[in-house]
Amino acid sequence: MDYNLIRITDSTVLSDAGICYYDPIEEVIKEIGSGYMMGTNPTSPVIHKLMLVIKNGSIKKVNIKIVKNKELESLFDIKILPGVTAPGISSFADIDAFNDLEISDGLQPYSLIPFHVYIKTKGPINALLNAPLELTYEF
């Protein structure tokens, strides 16, 4: 996927910023909704590439937080890292599970900032229903 060819419009995200994924079937960026599932593998960690989409040029800082609860913590280790290129599994070794990602650089209007979500299951689970990500931003 060539990021230079992706066009961000007013309809890409509903708010001033949003978390999106690339839909390879329609070949477009889509905002994550309530029915978005993240595939997992019971035998090895999986890394998903998502994108922070900025629509409003007045945003100064964005925080992406993994929302945790006891049930989620008992089933998964989830970590996030920024970056255009896909990190290897070992890149997540020194990152605490359920970490936050704060971004204050590169927040331009109609831009996207890639980040990666690492999911390791603690049992025979094939999907994580409803991505547990919370997005907050400051003007």
Residue ranges and their predicted role:
Residues 10-12, 124-139:
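C-terminal interaction-tip segments
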